[in-house]
């Protein structure tokens, strides 16, 4: 059940709904009286006075422009997940993202802009990580090694592809090491 569903059910029952920091548990489980989103767990009523300043800061944060709204999904087994909705939409493909940073990075795919340039060969990249990975082509650095056959790779994806195909590698290495 999602937070909005629980909040509307609580409003029907006359409970305190819409509070940014408090959610009453509606499950049939033996829950503590209050559910505190700020600490991602339950707290006792006796803790109210101790956490009053925390509640005030949460109320202030809920009015801030930078506040990220969170959705709490409560499972039937009592576990819960805090999910951040994808509110940033790409105007080119309508892809959804959790932050403006991820949206801006994604839009570079559509615009063709590649702000990161290799100083050796002038290749350009959308992400800094891709440039750093590319630089290993020039340096010859191969930091990723197969533990079965000890072959080295410059990229993790190449090592993972090798590992999928290297099942016979272990038996070859073992036979070679132990054969007389």
From Swiss-Prot:
MF (Gene Ontology):
sequence-specific double-stranded DNA binding; zinc ion binding
> Per the UniProt entry, what species is this protein from, by scientific name?
Mus musculus
Cross-linked sites for Glycyl lysine isopeptide (Lys-Gly) (interchain with G-Cter in SUMO2): 9
- What task does this protein carry out? May be involved in transcriptional regulation.
The ranges of region (Disordered) come to 1-62
Zinc finger (C2H2-type) positions are 88-110, 116-138, 144-166
- State the GO CC annotations: nucleus
PROSITE patterns with a match to the protein in the record: ZINC_FINGER_C2H2_1, ZINC_FINGER_C2H2_2
Keywords (alphabetical) are: Isopeptide bond, Metal-binding, Nucleus, Phosphoprotein, Repeat, Transcription, Transcription regulation, Ubl conjugation, Zinc, Zinc-finger
Question: What is the designated name of this protein?
Answer: Zinc finger protein 740
Composition skew (Basic and acidic residues), residue ranges: 31-56
Query: Where located?
Result: Nucleus
InterPro entries given in the database record: Znf_C2H2_sf, Znf_C2H2_type
Q: Where is the composition biased (Polar residues)?
A: 1-11
| Residue list for modification Phosphoserine | 19
The UniProt family comment states: Belongs to the krueppel C2H2-type zinc-finger protein family.
């Amino acid at each position: 059940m999602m937070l909005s569903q629980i909040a509307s059910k609580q409003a029907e029952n006359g409970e305190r709904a819409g509070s940014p920091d408090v959610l009453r548990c509606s499950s049939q489980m033996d829950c503590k009286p209050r559910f505190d989103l700020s600490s991602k767990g339950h707290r006792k009523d006796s803790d109210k006075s101790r956490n009053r300043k925390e509640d005030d800061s949460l109320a202030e944060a809920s009015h801030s422009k930078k506040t990220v709204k969170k959705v709490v999904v409560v499972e039937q087994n009592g576990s819960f997940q805090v999910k951040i909705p994808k509110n940033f939409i790409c105007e080119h493909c309508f892809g959804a993202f959790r932050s403006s940073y991820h949206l801006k990075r994604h839009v570079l795919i559509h615009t063709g802009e590649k702000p990161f340039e290799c100083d050796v060969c002038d290749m350009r990249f959308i992400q800094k990580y891709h440039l750093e990975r590319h630089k290993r082509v020039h340096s010859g650095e191969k930091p990723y090694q197969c533990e079965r056959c000890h072959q080295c790779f410059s990229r993790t994806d190449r090592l993972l592809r090798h590992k999928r195909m290297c099942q016979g590698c272990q038996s070859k290495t073992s036979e070679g090491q132990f054969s007389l």
